[in-house]
């Protein structure tokens, strides 16, 4: 429909309808498995905080890419309920992804994966930067990708798009 809004602000009632309260039949798989591709040796706090925040939402399981020994040790020391994996994200069984926070050039492959993942994904920081280039190359993020940039990341994102196609703006 041409008049269907592309953006909508949710109110309290919308959230009540969308969020399921766990009951006695709930378990980790019914509550959702979230894959996390966050953090780096330079920014380990991004991994620790994002995983802790995810765990605090009530998600059933968090699977964290812990291919770096140091980051994996930190993660399990702070968040022992986290399940770490070391292989490619494509081999993991998750319901959704979150990533990009605290990532750097060494995790470029993870951010690329988020852009193409068949599962829904929340893209932050480094993944937002990569998303602009991805879009300008003619690719689509699809309807299940959410960008969560802070003001500086949003400015870089929009600047890249504007520089590539100024006539669109």
Write out the residue ranges for each language-model feature.
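Small-residue (G/A/S/T)-rich helix-start motifs and N-terminal tracts that mark the onset
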Residues: 1-122, 129-146, 151-169
């Amino acid at each position: 429909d041409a008049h269907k809004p592309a953006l909508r602000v949710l109110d309290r009632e919308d959230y009540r309808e969308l969020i399921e309260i766990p009951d006695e039949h709930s378990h980790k798989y019914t509550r959702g498995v979230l894959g996390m591709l966050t953090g780096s040796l330079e920014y380990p706090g991004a991994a620790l905080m994002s995983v802790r925040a995810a765990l605090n939402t009530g998600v059933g399981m968090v699977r964290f890419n812990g291919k770096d020994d140091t980051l994996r040790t930190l993660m399990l020391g702070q968040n022992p309920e986290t399940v770490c994996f070391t292989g490619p994200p494509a081999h993991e069984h998750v319901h959704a992804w979150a990533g990009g926070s605290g990532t750097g050039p060494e995790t470029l492959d993870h951010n690329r994966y988020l852009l193409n993942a068949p599962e829904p994904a929340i893209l932050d920081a480094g993944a937002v930067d990569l998303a602009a280039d991805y879009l300008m190359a003619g690719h689509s993020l699809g309807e299940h990708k959410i960008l969560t940039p802070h003001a500086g990341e949003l400015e870089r994102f929009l600047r890249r798009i504007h520089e590539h196609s100024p006539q669109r703006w």
